Amino acid sequence: MTHIRFIVAVCLLGLFGLTGCEPAPVAPSSSNGNKEVPQATTPTPGDAGAATSESGATMYEGVGYALPMKAGKYEILGIRTDNKDSSAAKTNAQASLLAHPDIACMVGLWAYNPPAILSALEDAGKIGQIKVVGFDEHPETLQAISDGKVVGTIVQQPYLFGFKSVEYLAALARKQEVKIPEDKMLYIPHTSVTADNVLEFKANIEKINAGEGDLPASDRTDYDITNTVKLSFITNSIDPFWVLAQKGCEKAEPVFNAKVDVIMPSNGTVEQQKQSIETFINNGGQGLAISPINPANQVDMINQAAAVMPVLCQDSDAPESNRLFYLGTSNYQAGRAAGKLVKQALPEGGKVMIFVGKLEVLNAQERSRGVIEELMDKPE
């Protein structure tokens, strides 16, 4: 049976957030007559690989572009980060509305971003006036698509992330062959959910959450599953997205005779992931799938695990580590798909702002770059 652990940090001074014990955000503001103006959370050079030039443009090094910039008919205003805090995400959206009254589209690249954007638009009375493009299958986002408040969302297949992670790790732990591409990238397709297919998609999600998801196809039918293997699936946070991945792990357990410990760090910190890995190693773990929070600073941690067991990265990659391969979405192509939704919503062009949790995370960089290069009409 799958074991699910939520890693909770001790909070001081009575501060708490929406999940676990993350400190509650204090939205900064500046005085503007009698109006309190929300201030956006912008990347700093040390925090998110961004640096502000003398011209005022911000160079997002992980993304590869200085913003704001013109992209054909579109003007990409910037990328707002929120440190995985939904309250800060809403503050960012509010600040963007005030700073850019003529903004035409807001693109949220992590699951909680579209609901935060919608909340800001609701407060401002601008639902329907500004287009919203999302990412992932947050229930509020799906409902908003049904209600005509969101253009669409790009969805991954976390259910398959869980199932295939267990399949491959169980085989590798037993020294059985897994076909790994030369580039060490095993992609699981993404799709676009719009008003045309949202009801069908929601019905499938409900089936998965009820434990009635379809059994995915395995790569092989001749796996030796004689001995039970002990695996760990570590996420980067607590989110409905990861509940779907957990359901995939549960579906895979009896198929591949595996015991899977699904760990969801409540605060989404590197320290929590490190603690979980060390505990898993000490308890005789045999295979690890992880979504790295800060890949550049987690190489040693991942290598420590890879020295004693097979390790793969899922959802977000750490390509400089000794992980065997990456399993998940092509985040760049998914970003381009989000850019295509922007084009459909704004065929005449307009101003676009991108919102995401942390630009230190590789999937955030790749999705952002995909959106930008699609709006630029850069060849794929």
Which residues fall in each region the model found?
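Bacterial N-terminal signal peptides that target proteins for export
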Residues: 1-8
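A residue-level marker of the well-folded mature domains of exported/periplasmic proteins
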Residues: 21-380
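Bacterial N-terminal signal peptides
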Residues: 9-17
